[in-house]
Amino acid sequence: MNTIWIAVGALALLGLVFGAILGYASRRFAVEDDPVVEKIDAILPQSQCGQCGYPGCRPYAEAVGLQGEKINRCAPGGEAVMLKIAELLNVEPQPCDGEEQQAAPVRMLAVIDENNCIGCTKCIQACPVDAIVGATRAMHTVMSDLCTGCNLCVDPCPTHCIELRPVNETPDSWKWDLNTIPVRIIPVEQHA
């Protein structure tokens, strides 16, 4: 019975010693993050789509905060994200498409040819916003409300049954921006 208590005590002592060493090391070798980069990263939509030319939202936030990259390259975030970053950095807002002369980008939507889909789930694994639903060896489909048109699901498909199609702007497909219409709350007087 004493050997069990000795073993338990030895393990507890080892846990305390290694915990203290890890605690000291985490404080001693801590890397300070730039608070501006953290704020920019919090503003970005975290879709990790790569449309900005960076592998994810965090590298793009670091490029904007530390290297002075353009603030208008986040396609899923659009103008709202660009304006928030411009306000945070106290810089002039830039056109969302990067150049004044270019036409506004057409919203694209991934469409799966369900007759040719073999249910391999490679597109589901590639989608950064979970816009594709389906199960193994079953038909997959794209939820159009969630799809950002990032093109990351097209290449992994072994049967090439996914294509990007432009979305026709109709009242049903339009993404309404609630900030475009100024809303004012009017106080109501209650009469007894």
UniProtKB/Swiss-Prot annotation:
Main location: membrane
Enzyme class: translocase
Cofactor details (free text): Binds 3 [4Fe-4S] clusters.
Positions with a binding annotation for [4Fe-4S] cluster 3: 127, 147, 150, 153
Domain 4Fe-4S ferredoxin-type: start-end pairs: 108-137, 138-167
Chain positions recorded as [4Fe-4S] cluster 1 binding sites: 49, 52, 57, 74
Annotated GO biological process: electron transport chain
Location of region: Hydrophobic: 1-26
Keyword flag ATP-binding: no
4Fe-4S domain span: 32-91
GO cellular component, one term: plasma membrane
Compartments, as annotated in UniProt: Cell inner membrane
Keywords: 4Fe-4S, Cell inner membrane, Cell membrane, Electron transport, Iron, Iron-sulfur, Membrane, Metal-binding, Repeat, Translocase, Transport
Described function: Part of a membrane-bound complex that couples electron transfer with translocation of ions across the membrane. Required to maintain the reduced state of SoxR.
HAMAP family per the UniProt record, alphabetical: RsxB_RnfB
Similarity section: Belongs to the 4Fe4S bacterial-type ferredoxin family. RnfB subfamily.
Protein name per UniProt: Ion-translocating oxidoreductase complex subunit B
